[in-house]
Amino acid sequence: MSERAPVVTIDGPSGAGKGTISQLLAQHLGWQLLDSGAIYRVLALAAIHHNVELENEESITLLAAHLDVKFLTGNDTDPVQVILEGEDVTTDIRTQECSNAASKVAAFPRVREALLRRQRAFKTAPGLIADGRDMGTVVFPSAPAKLYLTASAEERAQRRYNQLQDKGFDVNIERLLSEIIERDDRDMNRPVAPLVPAEDALIIDTSGKGIDEVLALALNFINQKLSDTN
């Protein structure tokens, strides 16, 4: 069944709207969803749950190969639920402990290779929306429809600022902007799987655009690409 399941990849920098659009597309199409950005955090949490030493590459690799994780979409306003071994860990994977552990396990080449295969296993009928940074270039290079969402650093900083303000955090927008620019430079110039649009991706600049407008652009492109492959 997986061979016949189409994949839509959605790549781009943080704050460009990938998560929101990916969730809405998965809901609209009734497809599976892969949030690749959460995968390493989920693996780290699984290691903590199973008392696996984070420095043990062999054990972490084995855990990665059999990682039991699902991403569930609710309604438009609910965040994507991350399910690890049947348990909702959506909040748990966002802790600082989990973040630190994720950085450790991500450093192992064999772990990265195992998770690459695990991510590809998400390709099941009726289809997959793959949200990440290298979905269209590395993980699913043969996907029939590839999107690359971007926005100005200033707009992404403002979006992040608004999110944190809504949660009651006191933040400095200039610092957020500086961090975004630094991360962009790091991601786009890293030697392995740099953050770049796939050659055949539709690039959508979400600056100044509403969610409905971006969703319509994405759906029109996806429908066109899928009709071309049938």
UniProtKB/Swiss-Prot annotation:
Keywords: ATP-binding, Cytoplasm, Kinase, Nucleotide-binding, Transferase
Gene Ontology terms: cellular component: cytosol
Keyword match Transcription regulation: no
InterPro entries per record: Cytidylate_kin (IPR003136), Cytidylate_kinase_dom (IPR011994), P-loop_NTPase (IPR027417)
UniProt cross-references to CDD domains, sorted A to Z: CMPK (cd02020)
Catalytic activity: CMP + ATP = CDP + ADP; dCMP + ATP = dCDP + ADP
Compartments (UniProt record): Cytoplasm
Alphabetical GO biological process terms: nucleobase-containing small molecule interconversion; pyrimidine nucleotide metabolic process
The protein's enzyme class: transferase
Main location: cytoplasm
Annotated ATP binding sites: 12-20
EC number in record: 2.7.4.25
Highest rank taxon of the organism: Bacteria
Molecular function GO labels: ATP binding; CMP kinase activity; dCMP kinase activity
Family membership noted in the UniProt record: Belongs to the cytidylate kinase family. Type 1 subfamily.
HAMAP family named among the record's database cross-references: Cytidyl_kinase_type1 (MF_00238)
Protein name: Cytidylate kinase
Organism: Shewanella baltica (strain OS155 / ATCC BAA-1091)
